Amino acid sequence: MLAPEARGDLIHFTENTRDAMETFFNSYDLAEYSEVNPNKLNRKETDELLGVIRERFKSELVITDEDFVKHLAFALIRAANITTSVKVNYVGAYEYTIGGKKFLVKDAWVFPLIKECMKKFNKPNPVRTFCATFEDAYIVIARSLPKLFLNRTIGKRGIPSGYEFLGADFLTATSVCLNDHEKAIVLQASRAAIDRAVSSSVDGKIVSLFDLGRLS
């Protein structure tokens, strides 16, 4: 138990610093704060990484600077469909067209490239960290292309129709691009492989197909 004088000091501290602390943090520029996050790269790391990957894409895919983000978007979509597990065998490929030019990108090229470029950041799962860093961009893009995620891997996670893109295993459920219902779907999808018996809902809305019949 605190001595009377100690309690007095604590009250004094609280009363004299609360307003000052609120004023300081209410106007604090978040760009001045950074941290080491095992799930994502910080702004400085991201800028450095993008510079390296952009040059590799330009050299090996023969692309333009202005189209780089589009190529990056397709890599994120592919990662969502095959998962970012370290156990994935990169034996497939994906194809798309930009500006009338067709690109065939092999998994065995793009994901090892990402791992190589991520090596200096020493992350346990470099591909997952890479994709999670750009999850906001992925969400915006994937919403526009829902039919690209109709596959067995994502289907097994029991995600409601129209939300299949939320089955990507690199989503953190913290993106400002997600509403509460969508965050619940992401969280439920990540648990599905571990415990499919868990049921959940947000405002009566289905967040997992495994809940069908339980909420009626």
Curated annotation (Swiss-Prot):
GO cellular component: viral capsid
InterPro entries: Closter_coat
Domain of life assignment: Viruses
One of the GO BP terms on file: transport of virus in host, cell to cell
Keywords: Capsid protein, Transport, Viral movement protein, Virion
Compartment(s) of residence: Virion
Functional summary from the UniProt entry: Component that constitutes the tail found at one end of the virion. Together with Hsp70h and p64, encapsidates the 5'-terminal portion of the viral genome. Movement protein that is involved in local cell-cell movement via plamodesmata. At least five viral proteins, CP, CPm, p6, p64 and Hsp70h are essential for cell-cell movement.
Protein's recorded name: Minor capsid protein
